[in-house]
């Protein structure tokens, strides 16, 4: 029993770090956070963007050629939206550390995404959305989900 407790305590911090969501699980979480029809974008748009940006992985990171990094389930960029402490000239318009975007709790990612989508370019700010989701049947991404 004691060794089981030690094992659980060792892995507990890992559970808080990040998560790979299921499609419907993410759709439900995004809906709870108010993304369904936010700025006119249906929930399917957001789920599609997350699929092609991060494969539903909150811990996804990708380094860009300009030295910035994209973080989290929606691949939010450190040049403009968050501070990672290593991107020169970071604007940090969401006023958050980039590490907050890697959590299994998607609140910081959703709140920042709401600022991004309100910034004038809408979801065109996400290259993967523009290339893989825009103009497609994005409702397919939430079809069969109990929302």
Swiss-Prot record:
UniProt binding sites for substrate: 119
Disulfide bonds: 24-145, 48-133, 82-98, 94-112
UniProt EC number: 3.2.1.17
Source organism (scientific name): Gallus gallus
Keyword terms: Allergen, Antimicrobial, Bacteriolytic enzyme, Disulfide bond, Glycosidase, Hydrolase, Secreted, Signal
Top EC class of this enzyme: hydrolase
Subunit structure: Monomer.
Catalyzed reactions: Hydrolysis of (1->4)-beta-linkages between N-acetylmuramic acid and N-acetyl-D-glucosamine residues in a peptidoglycan and between N-acetyl-D-glucosamine residues in chitodextrins
Protein name, per record: Lysozyme C
